[in-house]
């Protein structure tokens, strides 16, 4: 993978909202049509994840039906990356990942656009969509 892309994906808790804001294009679960939305991405360990605050989301339903999608970097570096979504369903794994994400969101720099503290980890585990993102070997 190009080093500029690796750097753009290497967010930390100190990363700004714009650094973690991307678009994704999924394939509609019912329509088969492309659906593009804006979303934040997160890191836990060396992995990249997509999630949102607890709620039902159409992007998640789309990825469950069609896990291939496009991950659009758009702030600073612009790149359209073929990607694959794998739902994270194991409660223990979800708790570990959401603990990292909630700690990230509760950083002081996010106070301007997020009510803090965000929902408790258990609320995220019980009600938030969570997918692990991988990129095809062709990007390597």
Each language-model region and where it sits:
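Short beta-strand segments
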Residues: 19-53, 69
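Short, structured beta-strand-loop surface elements
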Residues: 54-139
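Extreme N-terminal tail/first-helix region
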Residues: 1-21
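A generic local structural motif
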Residues: 8-11, 36-37, 117-119
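A generic structural micro-feature
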Residues: 16, 31-33, 63, 125
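General secondary-structure edge motif
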Residues: 12, 21, 43-44, 78-81
